[in-house]
Amino acid sequence: MPKLEQFEIKKYWQIFSGLKPVENKVNHDQVLPILYNSKLDSSILNKIWFLADIDDDDNLDFEEFVICMRLIFDMVNKNIDKVPDELPDWLIPGSKAKLVKERKQRKQIENADIPKVETPKIDWYISPEDKKSYENILSGIQTATDGSYSYSSTTLVLKSKFFNIGTSDFEKTWKLVNPKNFASIDKDPTLYFIHILRQRNDLGCNIPSELPKALLDSFSKERVTYDLNSNQSQVTRSSNVRSNTNMSQHTIEAIRMNEIPRGNPNDAASLEIELNSLDAELNRIRDEITRQEDTILIREQFEGLLSYKEQQYQKSKQSSMSPVKLNAKSISDDLSNIEQQVGVLENYLADKKVELQQLESQIQSVNK
């Protein structure tokens, strides 16, 4: 991790001055737009804030602000893989060295007084009370046409309930309960998905690397889908059929799971198969539309930051007596970049809505 350069400190001073510090300090609300714009997990941002706030007053003076900004930029630019547990010596300002040393000593004393407790393991038993609670959560999750649950629709709801869990924990747990990597999973593995995440959030349990054998066998069973492009199975026919009426008949010798060929368009059964295929495709598009809610949330954050920058720019024009003037060109560039990103998100959402409408029209034409 490269050390601080003079040009960095000047850049951080411009940002710090633009936040209108009071008594040379900024609070969390003032820094919040910068934190949001970094797109880092809240757990990472909380740890960075804790390290930077050396005097523990819930505010950052300029020296502490420099620490906060440098750690954020290093994480965003992937100069470091994770936030350090302790500040490196070169990032500790001389005026704060004593406070950092005292805080480290307090932490050591506190850790010495606390008996070491092993991280609890996941309890695989789901009590009737827990199951009822999980089913209440499931009732608020959008399901596919076959009643299964996708990753995007499930995590969208759970992120508002489990605040101590990062994206990596969601992904690791999903892979655990979905060993076959299906696009969506049934109710039982989804219940265990919630069960594991709840214990991770509330008790700090480690996410296991494997399932108990009984659960693994259950969750690995093939699911029936209506995807005509699936390679799950093949349809074979037998022509050796006897008939008392001397009429030629064909019987299906084996149809395993869901590989069904597209038949004669005039055949009612074939049309039903095509309808099932379109239903499956519609479900996929709806899942993507669900994911747009995350996009809309990001868009709202960008718009909030845009509004903040506009207010900041207007204040800078009016405050000609301010000792430190904001860089108007920099702010203008920021506004332009944010507007472009919002535009891209809007166009992406519009395209997905058009795709959904086209698919619904196809289904309606098949139903006629």
Swiss-Prot record:
Residue ranges of every copy of the EF-hand domain listed in the record: 40-75
Entry membrane topology: Peripheral membrane protein
Swiss-Prot/TrEMBL GO biological process terms: actin filament organization; ascospore wall assembly; endocytosis; endosomal transport; reticulophagy
InterPro entries the record matches: EF-hand-dom_pair, EF_Hand_1_Ca_BS, EF_hand_dom, EH_dom, End3
Domain of life: Eukaryota
Annotated GO CC locations: actin cortical patch; actin cytoskeleton-regulatory complex; endosome membrane; plasma membrane
Binding positions for Ca(2+) per the UniProt entry: D53, D55, D57, N59, E64
Localization of this protein: Cell membrane; Endosome membrane; Cytoplasm, Cytoskeleton, Actin patch
Coiled-coil regions listed in the entry: 266-368
tRNA-binding keyword on record: no
Subunit comment: Component of the PAN1 actin cytoskeleton-regulatory complex.
Entry protein name: Actin cytoskeleton-regulatory complex protein END3
Taxon lineage: Eukaryota, Fungi, Dikarya, Ascomycota, Saccharomycotina
